[in-house]
Amino acid sequence: MLNVVIFGAPGSGKGTQSELIIKEYGLDHISTGDVLRGEMKAETELGKIAKDYIEKGQLVPDELIVDMLANVLDSKKPAKGVIFDGFPRTIPQAKALKKMLNERGTDVSVMLNLQVEEEELIKRLLERGKVSGRSDDNLETIKSRLDVYHTQTAPLADYYVGEGKHVAIKGMGTIEEIFGRIKEAVNNVK
């Protein structure tokens, strides 16, 4: 099974490249946000617990998210593998994901780290804000999101370096050029 974690700062192209990876390799897409919303909407036991945390303005605990992801994996039984979108974001989440996957006889195959210069990230996000109308794509919010990424999320790359799973992908250039680099990295893992 090919299990991919796609990683990068806001605006690095994770969504765009995820779609291409899914098509190219026939992977199932697991978006943590979608899973969380789905569990809450279906009013599952885990969904009710998560909703309680969210309504109190608290973060949903890692264990709960991992349990939800485990349920999705167990129900989907992906034949070729999975691309994880939005998870893990911290080292404890990465360790919990590894444990859960190991219990199912698999592991993360590769962590693709899309690396884009900060000026380019800001440019892309401001442009996306104009096109999509996303209210969180304004300069002040963008800078705040990038700060959070650098302080809280970026250290996760070092964890995957230690695991021998990290591949830095130059995220500059055309969509096709970037995807070419991704394919080269993934094909070396398969």
From Swiss-Prot:
Organism ancestry: Bacteria, Pseudomonadati, Bacteroidota, Bacteroidia, Bacteroidales
Top-level taxon in the UniProt lineage: Bacteria
Protein name, as recorded: Adenylate kinase
One Gene Ontology cellular component: cytoplasm
The organism of origin for this protein: Parabacteroides distasonis (strain ATCC 8503 / DSM 20701 / CIP 104284 / JCM 5825 / NCTC 11152)
Pfam families: ADK
PANTHER family: NUCLEOTIDE KINASE
Region of interest: LID: 127-137
The EC number(s) this enzyme carries: 2.7.4.3
Subunit structure: Monomer.
Location within or outside the cell: Cytoplasm
Chief localisation class: cytoplasm
